[in-house]
Amino acid sequence: MSDASISGSEPELDPEDMEEEEEDDEDDDEEEEEEEDEEDNDGDDEDDKQDINEKSQNAALGEDSPEQGEEGWKRSTTSGQSGQESDEAKKKRLQKPANLRRNIRKLLREDQLESVTKTAQQEELERRKRLEQQRKDYPLPLTLPPVSLDFLQEEIELRAADVSQLVKSQEIICLDSSSGESDDEGKVKSHSIKDEIIELSSGEEDNLQISDNADSTNEVDGDITTENSGSHVNDALNQADHLGRVLVNINHPPNEKDIFLAPQLARAVKSHQIGGIRFLYDNLVESLERFSGSSGFGCILAHSMGLGKTLQVISFLDVLFQHTSAKTVLAIVPVNTLQNWLAEFNMWLPPPESLPKDHNQELVQPRAFKVHTMNDEHKTTAARAKVVNDWATDGGVLLMGYEMYRLLSLKKSFTAGRKKKSKKAAGPVIIDLDEEDRQQEMLKGIEKALSRPGPDVVICDEGHRIKNCHASTSQALKNIRSRRRVVLTGYPLQNNLIEYWCMVDFVRPDFLGTRQEFSNMFERPILNGQCVDSTPQDKRLMRYRSHVLHSLLEGFVQRRGHTVLKAQLPFKEEHVILVRLSKIQRDLYTEFMNRFRDAGNSGWLGLNPLKAFCVCCKIWNHPDVLYEALQKENLANEQDLDVEDLGTNNRCNAQSGKIKVEPNSLGALMGETAHTKQLQGIVLNPSHEKANQVVTYEWAKEILSDYIPGQLQNSPKMVLLFHLIEESMRMGDKILVFSQSLSTLSIMEEFLAKRKMPIPAGSDGQEGHTWIRNVNYYRLDGSTSASERERLINQFNDPSNEKVWLFLLSTRAGCLGVNLIGANRVVVFDASWNPCHDAQAVCRVYRYGQRKPCYIYRLVSDFTLEKKIYDRQITKQGMSDRVVDDLNPEVNFTRREVENLLHFVEEEPDASRQHLDSSSFHEAVLQKACLQYPHLITKEPFQHESLLLDRKEQKLTLAEKKAAKRGYEEEKRASVPYTRPSYTQYYPAPDHNLGNIPAFSQRHWRPLMKGDDRPVASVRPLQSTPIPMLPRHVSVNHPGSASASVHPYNFPVNYLQRAGVLVQKVVTTTDIVIPGMTTSTDVQARISAGESIHVIRGTKGTYIRTSDGRIFAIRASGKQKSGEVRRQATSGAQGSSAPYLSNGRHSTSSPSQQDSEDPPRPLSPDSPEILNELQKYADAAAARGSHTAPQLQNLGLHHQGINPAPKLQPRKRKDPQDQSSHWPSNKRNPYSQLSYPNTGGFGVTPSTMNHNLVRSSNPVFMGPGGGSSHFQLPSLLSDPQTGLPLVQDSLLTHSSGTSSAPSVPPHYLLPRGFPLPFSQSLLPQTRMFAPYPSQILNRGLPTNNPASTFPGYLSSHSNYQASPGTSSRPLPSGETELGSCEEDGRDDDVVEVTGE
């Protein structure tokens, strides 16, 4: 029990809650980590951001479509990179709504998994093979079980690797980790029975697989019991022999003797308990030889509550101590069940001194080991050290609570001892250093005995307590060196799959991989398919992964459900009654929700719905609870619920500074000072309240100003509760009432004291006296001592006690280790956040020993947060059924309904319109309630289990189960990891002295390379593009293959628009050639005329998507720095300036300063300028038939309004202040040397481009920055051709730019061989002016006029003659260095277009 928590609790807080919390004040940080981990346990990073094409691609399920799966693996990054996410990605992940689906990422390849994971799975595989081999080599004696020989022979021959049921209805597929497909390989050993085949794979590892013939692949194995899974669950074989003996080590080697249970145990155990004992033996012992020579394995005994797990463990321990070398066993149990465990040991295995000397050994066999107990009676360190030392020396079983073990085993507890004595003293404090040293030595001795080396076997009762791997209790348990660990739990999966992983990771460390690997492979696929709004593929993947996880754990998790009880106990009915709020409750709830709505999601309510739940509980249980809290002026966060999931610092604290230590608490053990300081800070420090967003009950004062307490009708829940109590008593049935709120239990007692008891059935008593505590009813909560608890339970269960009819219990204190079969009716007054608690409360009566039909009533306030929490319970229970029990419960709630817990409905249906059909209820008490109080119930009561019906039609067929496991294996292997590209070859080596490079600039420097070592930059990861695409790999030698068809995609325009992305569909009227990249293997990336393209503008940039699925991304480099020189061509008349350069034509240029305040304005994709421009191309194409040869004089660059064409430059480099100043005077003009880097290229003048298609205002080039733009081509899609439309017609009129001043391009835009950012050779020979390939001119250029507008370097392939000024001489090898200098020393996968 968490003593520090209890010590500072108000009387309303149930100490049992803290008993379950078990964390000291030093663990607050760990609880914060737990809360953060629960918010982000999916293991993803950048992929948490919404993928806009997610639903259309449906996560590229590898097992559904291998082709899509391979593509998905290429698009996904590896799990190993998840830790390297940026802060921006983290912020965006946190902003994502909780109810949105998550992207499911693929796991690392299997060879990249942690070695410990592969080792753990391999060891389990080998263990199951050994057991199977033992069954084959040493079959069961035919005389052992009382079953037919035919049935037995079938089981002996066909039982494979701890099968769950008869082989005729069960298949086993052990996961294959070999590199190839092992389904079609391997030796086949066939058995003719039931047409089943047992295959032994011959891959890298031998794996046992069972397959059916083709006729049975689509059949569902519906004969098996779905709630039973694991080994030894065939109760037909779990029987005693003809002599009444129970054999434990079945199929044992001949050199080992038969091991039987003690005679008194053999007479008591049921068939399912025999299976559990054998299951424990197979996992922990396996064989006597292996027990002494190996470290062993752990397992989980996941039997539902009431199936006798304690008896199974006691029986197994008796065998363990008698027949193995085991000496010590540590049993860690909830502190309130310590006495129950000791009583069970004494009952089933009495100590020798308790038996008479002449007792018959064949009837009762005493235990041969001691049972040591460490409880709250052992206060001092010396007393505890004595118990531990006796246990370590004499051997036996040591029983202790979780909190005690944590305190004694963690080393940090040793140094905290002196801090606890920091209270003020009246005089000088004398410290006995010798005594302190002795204390420390004793603590170290205890820790060594408990953990190093620790016991031979560790048993954790209620093992679902190991649900947070960061909590100190879990860490302390994992420090135990023993690998023989047993977890007992009736409810293995409570809240989420990560908690299940924590429990499995305790018994089998690293078996399921790391937390992130488990999240990616199992948790998120299962969660994504849980709700009604999940896609069909999500649901299919959910069923697949649930089955794979269920099968993975089948060898060491034995699950037995309530179906075992149903065959041996009377029937049980659970009814849910949805209750209406009274007027005062509705007013209070409305006001509270309005405060929440005004505060927004950033308030404390939105951040932690459980805090709101604590306040709301006071409203819907009864307004008197809230009224009393208001009178005491308690803070809103001082709830009185025993809720363990409240996260950080949500426990309620006492208003006063007094510390209340319960008799059964561990308050003396734990430091109270820190908690007291925290308590005082809450009370006395207003700023602390504000910082923690603490809200008082001020909002309720006005509504409750005239409130009259003590009226039962103010809460319809309470009215129905007393109806159920009194009617049950009249029928002669005892009843239990569970509530989380201790204040609510107190209010119930106040109303009981005012009401008269009804006359029980068959009683001659008279009605008249009121209820009296400890006479007519009992109350049990966390403050009840262990001895008092045992006395109350025994008296209540006594059939002869006809005075006590009611038992009030707090949900957390009364749901564990309590047997209350004296009652057969239960009322769950309020829904718990954790469905486990309510289920355990129900099972207090529905267990062995119950002789009457059981009726359960769950009261839930409709149209409130409580209803949403109940809905969440159903989802959690459904997930448990899928994973643990392999059931297929029907999904009833959408994810939005589940996650949006603070759902507020202002108006509820009119009570007068509600009609309840009471005839549909066979239960008399409920039927009478519907007749008498129809106005208090919103809907007809329904059965709780009806929401979790097993959908038989959704069960996986045998073929689907194989496909699920095969897909799981393929997915582990096939993901392709992304490796970050290295750009080291683009930068100077460390040994280069930068001062020795003339006029040093990275753009003037190029690395020395061999002839074939061209700089090749890696492609950006495909995830940078919002829409996934399929890369096309086209050979350089086959340019025509660029037009090859690719896999078509359905373009999700509606999802893009819904996400706020602007999508514009444009039909091109002319060919558009996309500039290429240095790493491109495409020789032609072209958008043909008449093709429909989508221009997509999002927050991250602008994209073009072609009809064949290709994506071209355009990124803006941002605004230019203020210090940069921006040039603008001067305005003037035609030919006013002298020619500067010649590349076959004349142009005018005179650089001048451009107004820095006038950047090019961006245009939207549907702007009039763009649409007009496209229309001009359409008009030109229509008139091309009559005008075949555009004239040269119409194509000068001195037209009015032409803006300077863009300049290509590296993204990460600044513009030079003055290029001419860097050229040595003795060199010739550098622009005459410009060419393609490395080997040559095309010289494309800006006259071949229309400026509106080049400048940043074009939607193709537009980015969010609105400034200069650049291409960012994220895949091997580009073509090394340059420019946009190359076809110029005289019919095209030139649009004026945004600048009003007429201008001409500056001189540096008109060189021969205009440099473009490509460092690879496009042609077999090196040329200054290479001819265009003929494929690019396939649109029919004019051929009859030599005076073409196109430069002469097109002549060799287009029938044009070169202009007189065109030079086509090849450059000497040394003349390319200046021409390529501007393109070196940078990231070649980014091309920036900057307007000068």
Curated annotation (Swiss-Prot):
Record's compositionally biased regions (Acidic residues): 11-49, 1380-1396
Motif mapping: DEAH box: 461-464
**Motif LXXLL motif 1 in this chain: where?**
549-553
The intrachain disulfides are: none
GO molecular function annotation: ATP binding; ATP hydrolysis activity; DNA binding; helicase activity
Q: Where would I find the Helicase C-terminal domain in this sequence?
A: 717-891
Which Gene3D superfamilies does the protein's record reference?
Answer: P-loop containing nucleotide triphosphate hydrolases, SWI2/SNF2 ATPases, N-terminal domain, Tandem AAA-ATPase domain
Q: What is known of its domains?
A: Leu-Xaa-Xaa-Leu-Leu (LXXLL) motifs are known to be important for the association with nuclear receptors.
Similarity comment: Belongs to the SNF2/RAD54 helicase family.
Name assigned to this protein = Helicase ARIP4
Provenance organism: Xenopus tropicalis
What is the gene called?
Answer: rad54l2
